[in-house]
Curated annotation (Swiss-Prot):
Protein's UniProt keywords contain Isomerase: yes
Keywords on record: Flavonoid biosynthesis, Isomerase
Site (Important for catalytic activity) location in chain: Y108
Originating gene: CHI
Catalytic class of the enzyme: isomerase
Substrates-to-products reaction catalysed: a chalcone = a flavanone
Function of the molecule: Catalyzes the intramolecular cyclization of bicyclic chalcones into tricyclic (S)-flavanones. Responsible for the isomerization of 4,2',4',6'-tetrahydroxychalcone (also termed chalcone) into naringenin.
Enzyme Commission number(s): 5.5.1.6
Annotated pathway: Secondary metabolite biosynthesis; flavonoid biosynthesis
Similarity field: Belongs to the chalcone isomerase family.
Protein name per UniProt: Chalcone--flavanone isomerase
């Protein structure tokens, strides 16, 4: 087991994404891969709705480095396969979505499942199991309300489970709200954020920048202690729907 690389916390708007977390659904401590806002360009103004952080098991760094070490940040950012390898990689992942603007659980789940179903249908892999997983996903969110600062946590196991947790203040919950055993759904949730049509180009760019640095500095950066610094992401990327 590799020790976690030295990573920095990221601040998106007023929300801090810590360098490491230990989420429900896994016994492992995960490192922050990258973070950024999700929003829309409305009437010439970029309106931010959520802040998103993607965490990875420390072993993701050497696993991804085998193929991607030596690539520039631009090459990684532009590569569909790079982000696909993150989504499908054999390591634990956590996605945290923190509300900048209020949103109902129904609004959130309907948009996420719409993106997931579109991805599956394009890939020719939408069947009864996925339909049932979508129904369970929507049920988990049906009575939820997310004021600003509230967070959703998705813990994604390489074995296929998707653990869903909620927090009203952004802190890491100790107990999961639901576990959905469907690998395509687990992967599609992250794909909808950082995939080829992902909703957060900022998070994708942050992942490319930070992982590129971890690949390059892997030998020096990996230690038994995680170094934490301030890392503020510039909020300049226009996110399309």
């Amino acid at each position: 087991m590799s020790a976690p690389p030295c990573v920095a916390e990221v601040k998106v708007e007023s929300y801090v994404f810590p360098a490491t977390v230990k989420p429900p659904g896994t016994a492992k401590t995960l490192i922050l891969g990258g973070a950024g806002a999700r929003g829309l360009n409305i009437d010439g103004k970029f309106v931010k709705f959520t802040a998103i952080g993607v965490y990875l098991e420390a072993d993701a760094v050497p696993s991804l480095a085998v193929k991607w070490n030596g690539k520039s940040v631009e090459e990684l950012t532009d590569s569909v396969q790079f982000f696909r390898d993150i989504v499908t990689g054999p390591f634990e992942k956590l996605t945290r979505i923190t509300m900048i603007l209020p949103l109902s659980g129904k609004q959130y789940s309907e948009k996420v499942t719409e993106n997931c179903v579109a991805f599956w249908k394009a890939a020719g892999m939408y069947g009864d199991a996925e339909s049932k997983a979508i129904d369970k996903f929507n049920d988990v969110f049906s009575d939820q309300m997310f004021p600003p600062g509230a967070s959703i946590f998705f813990t994604q196991s390489p074995l296929g489970s998707l653990t869903v947790s909620f927090s009203k203040d952004g802190s890491m919950p100790e107990i999961a709200s639901a576990v959905i055993e469907n690998k395509p759904l687990s992967e599609a949730v992250l794909e909808s954020i950082i995939g080829s049509k992902g909703v957060s180009p900022e998070a994708k760019q942050s992942l490319a920048v930070r992982l590129s640095e971890m690949f390059i500095n892997g030998g020096d950066a990996i230690s038994g202690k995680v170094g934490v610094e301030n890392d503020v992401i510039p909020q300049t990327v226009v996110v399309s729907k």
